[in-house]
């Protein structure tokens, strides 16, 4: 049986600066903390047989640094193109990982051992870039690309050496690089408001949105080197933003956001029975609803 628990939390402090009109610079610093526990138990129906339990755990406490830029190129009085990019610093995470192995009979723990990996984790270097076309206050079309270099990060995992005619099988708990894949994501979308200041039609003041993305996961199920394909995911979404107040203004009014998203995941793995590649596929829908009471709540602080 398998079960697990845990997760990460993050607090972010960000600041932006516009040294001159077309260019803005930004910087984010964040603190990450959390933990995880993964339990694996192998038991047998015979009361005289010993069971084995393994508990993998760690506590994480580290920082994250990100810098970015934005360049605005006006086309005319109402239209413009915005180009942006970010870089996230990869670094060592100086936290340890633990593996506890227990051998149990029906009532007590017979043996117990703990393996420790010092400085077992790394965060990846990451870059992202995007371009957006603005047509007045009515239309936005954008494309984004993101790359995270997880293949260069070390991560704890159990390593097993298969027995040969001269050496018995063995296993160890190590933090090694190359166990994860680089993560990439390509996204595109648009939103359109027919007429933000329309007095004659409510639906002309609504904003209609749609988008799609394709992502290759950092997860790596190819433990034997025999799986050719990589895990991937793609999805499409659509939504509408409904202004609540019937006013002659567009900004700083309450809104209701409704959206639906369809997601497909494709995870190849090695079938233990046939020793051939199999694929785990999932399709699911997400329905989201959100309320913005007043956009003034989200005004950014400015340092004079």
Language model features with spans:
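Outer-membrane beta-barrel porins/channels
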Residues: 1-304
């Amino acid at each position: 049986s398998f079960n697990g628990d845990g997760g990460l939390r993050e607090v972010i402090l960000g600041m932006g600066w516009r040294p001159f009109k077309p260019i803005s610079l930004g910087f984010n610093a964040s603190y990450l903390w959390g933990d995880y526990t993964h339990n694996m138990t192998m038991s047998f129906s015979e009361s005289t047989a010993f069971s084995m339990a393994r508990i993998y755990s760690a506590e994480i406490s580290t920082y994250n640094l990100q810098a970015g830029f934005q360049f605005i190129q006006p086309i005319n009085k109402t239209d413009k193109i915005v180009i942006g990019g970010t870089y996230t610093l990869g670094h060592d995470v100086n936290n340890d990982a633990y593996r506890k192995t227990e051998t149990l009979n029906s009532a007590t723990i017979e043996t117990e051992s703990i393996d420790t990996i010092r400085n077992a984790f790394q965060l990846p270097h990451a870059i992202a870039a995007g371009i957006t076309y603005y047509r007045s206050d009515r239309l936005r079309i954008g494309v984004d690309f993101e790359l995270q270099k997880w293949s260069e990060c070390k991560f704890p995992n159990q390593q097993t050496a298969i027995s040969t005619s001269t050496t018995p099988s063995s296993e160890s708990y190590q933090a090694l690089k190359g166990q994860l894949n680089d993560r990439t994501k390509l996204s595109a979308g648009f939103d359109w408001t027919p007429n933000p200041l329309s007095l004659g039609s409510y639906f002309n003041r609504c904003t209609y949105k749609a988008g799609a993305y394709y992502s290759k996961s950092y997860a790596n199920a190819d433990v034997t080197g025999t799986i050719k394909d990589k895990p991937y995911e793609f999805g499409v979404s659509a939504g509408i933003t409904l202004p609540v107040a019937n006013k002659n203004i567009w900004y700083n009014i309450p809104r209701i956001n409704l959206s639906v998203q369809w997601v497909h995941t494709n995870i190849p793995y090695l079938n233990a029975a046939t020793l051939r590649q199999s694929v785990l596929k999932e399709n699911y829908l997400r329905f989201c609803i959100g309320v913005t009471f007043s956009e003034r709540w989200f005004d950014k602080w400015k340092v004079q």
